[in-house]
């Protein structure tokens, strides 16, 4: 089947201009005028495409590669066929991401559902007391509640709900069907389709008559340039705030409980659950399907492996994995020992069957 993308190619950027934009080195100036229009993987890259190379594993694909340029480490440039221009980079993955943003800026935000995303649809409802700055787009079926404030260049997707008094900064995108209640958002925030921000936290007091609801009167504070994936849920605080720090990226289907405080530039992969009042430091990376206990602290720069169960606080800079989570090398040694013993047992059982 022919590959037809939803994001049309760029009009074209010269390889010299792309190298300057990335701060990369063009290996051969004879290729300075080559025009780059899009990005693609090595195996599918064709005329006008740029791809990137991280290791020797793609060596076989390079033999048939038809890309117009390849971004790679200087130590790997000898693997690239002579007819393909090379951009030498110390950080090819990052530079490839920057190239994608340059060539496909429209893909940096959730897809607009109308051809006039900077206008207010006649089928949207915007309360008369709401304040919208210039160039705010509100797509069909969206609701902007009383007293809400929305900054310049922000787009509210179809069917989205912006609650009373919510403040949203400039150049944000709220995806279709998302809801934002009891929240303050900074600038450049992206919330993908179906996310739920600022609903009740899960708070109940046990009693002889059953569970008594604890009112949740806090807020959600989302700082600048945060991105929140589809169908992720972030509860508002009980009395204090739930806070997501600047530049943090949260994948799809993540649950963040009330009063959680997440630092800056964290990466949280899909299906992570963070229980109430946990404190996550700056630059933390959490693998998918991990559970974080409430009322614990995760230090700056911690890395947590996928499908871990974090019961206790973790000091800064550590790498943890497993259930319960423990230092990575302890987990790997234990896993190797279990595998070794299991293999020995299977070998013994097999020998017994042949006797």
From Swiss-Prot:
Documented EC number(s): 2.3.1.191
GO cellular component, as recorded? membrane
Q: Which reaction does it catalyse?
A: a UDP-3-O-[(3R)-3-hydroxyacyl]-alpha-D-glucosamine + a (3R)-hydroxyacyl-[ACP] = a UDP-2-N,3-O-bis[(3R)-3-hydroxyacyl]-alpha-D-glucosamine + holo-[ACP] + H(+)
Q: Which residues form the active site?
A: 258
What is its pathway?
Bacterial outer membrane biogenesis; LPS lipid A biosynthesis
Q: What Pfam families would the database entry show?
A: Hexapep, LpxD
Alphabetized InterPro entries for the sequence:
Hexapep, Hexapep_transf_CS, LpxD, Trimer_LpxA-like_sf, UDP_GlcNAc_AcTrfase_non-rep
Which GO molecular function annotation, any one, does this entry have? N-acyltransferase activity
GO BP field: lipid A biosynthetic process
What does this chain do? Catalyzes the N-acylation of UDP-3-O-acylglucosamine using 3-hydroxyacyl-ACP as the acyl donor. Is involved in the biosynthesis of lipid A, a phosphorylated glycolipid that anchors the lipopolysaccharide to the outer membrane of the cell.
Q: How does it assemble?
A: Homotrimer.
The family annotation for this protein states:
Belongs to the transferase hexapeptide repeat family. LpxD subfamily.
Instruction: Please identify the protein, giving its name as recorded.
Output: UDP-3-O-acylglucosamine N-acyltransferase
Name its species: Rhizobium rhizogenes (strain K84 / ATCC BAA-868)
């Amino acid at each position: 089947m022919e590959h037809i993308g939803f994001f049309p190619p760029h009009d074209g950027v010269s390889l010299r201009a792309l190298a300057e934009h990335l701060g990369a080195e063009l290996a051969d100036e004879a290729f300075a005028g080559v025009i780059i229009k899009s990005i693609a993987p090595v195996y599918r890259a064709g005329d006008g495409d740029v791809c990137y190379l991280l290791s020797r594993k793609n060596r076989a694909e390079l033999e048939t590669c038809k890309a117009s340029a390849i971004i790679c480490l200087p130590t790997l440039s000898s693997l690239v066929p002579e007819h393909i221009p090379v951009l030498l980079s110390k950080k090819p993955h990052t530079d490839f991401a920057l190239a994608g943003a340059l060539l496909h800026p429209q893909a940096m935000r959730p897809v607009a559902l109308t051809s006039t995303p900077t206008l207010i649809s006649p089928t949207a409802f915007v309360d008369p007391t709401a304040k919208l700055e210039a160039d705010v787009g509100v797509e069909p079926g969206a609701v902007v509640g009383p007293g809400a404030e929305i900054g310049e260049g922000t787009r509210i997707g179809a069917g989205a709900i912006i609650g009373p008094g919510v403040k949203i900064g400039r150049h944000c995108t709220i995806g279709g069907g998302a809801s934002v209640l009891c929240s303050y958002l900074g600038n450049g925030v992206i919330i993908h389709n179906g996310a739920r921000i600022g609903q009740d936290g899960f708070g109940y007091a046990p009693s002889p008559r059953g569970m008594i609801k604890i009112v949740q009167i806090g807020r959600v504070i989302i700082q600048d340039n945060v991105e929140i994936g589809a169908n992720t849920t972030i509860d508002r605080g009980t009395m204090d705030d739930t806070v997501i720090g600047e530049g943090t990226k949260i994948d799809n289907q993540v649950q963040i409980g009330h009063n959680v405080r997440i630092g800056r530039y964290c990466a949280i992969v899909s299906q992570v659950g963070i229980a109430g009042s946990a404190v996550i430091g700056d630059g933390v990376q959490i693998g998918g399907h991990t559970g974080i206990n409430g009322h614990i602290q995760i230090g700056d720069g911690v890395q947590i492996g996928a499908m871990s169960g974090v019961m206790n606080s973790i000091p800064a800079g550590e790498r943890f994995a497993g259930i319960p989570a423990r230092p990575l090398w302890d987990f790997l040694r234990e896993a190797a020992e279990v595998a070794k013993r299991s293999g020995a047992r299977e070998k013994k059982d097999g020998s017994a069957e042949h006797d």
